[in-house]
């Protein structure tokens, strides 16, 4: 885990990931009964990600081996036993994940994950 050294009194704080747009995940599983099986995995993913300290794509792959690393700081995660795809944009320097897309494989095939 990376540590941020704060000059005031020499305190140190671990810098963990922040997830932006978690609401998008909740809206997805609430959007249709057929997506209700994604609720547990979509609650678990941010819980795991916020404990991480990803400062490189290699750290993402070390934690989530099935994740696909794309250009432009994008990563694709398999959700609910590979039934759904989650696309995030990761700012490794600031340790922020921006949720960009969640959908089925068919929906994922219709987007450009490096742009969405």
Segments predicted by a language model, with ranges:
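Basic, Lys/Arg-enriched alpha-helical interface segments
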Residues: 1-83, 91-96, 105-116
């Amino acid at each position: 885990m990376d540590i941020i050294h704060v000059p005031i009194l020499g305190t140190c704080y671990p810098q963990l990931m922040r997830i932006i747009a978690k609401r998008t995940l909740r809206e997805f599983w609430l959007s249709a009964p057929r997506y209700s099986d994604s609720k547990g995995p979509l609650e678990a993913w941010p819980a795991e990600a916020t404990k991480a300290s990803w400062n490189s794509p290699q750290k993402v792959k070390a934690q989530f081996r099935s994740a696909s690393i794309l250009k432009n700081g994008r990563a694709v995660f398999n959700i609910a036993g590979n039934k759904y795809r989650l696309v995030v944009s990761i700012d490794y320097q600031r340790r922020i994940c921006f949720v960009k897309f969640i959908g089925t494989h068919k929906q994922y095939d219709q987007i450009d994950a490096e742009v969405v």
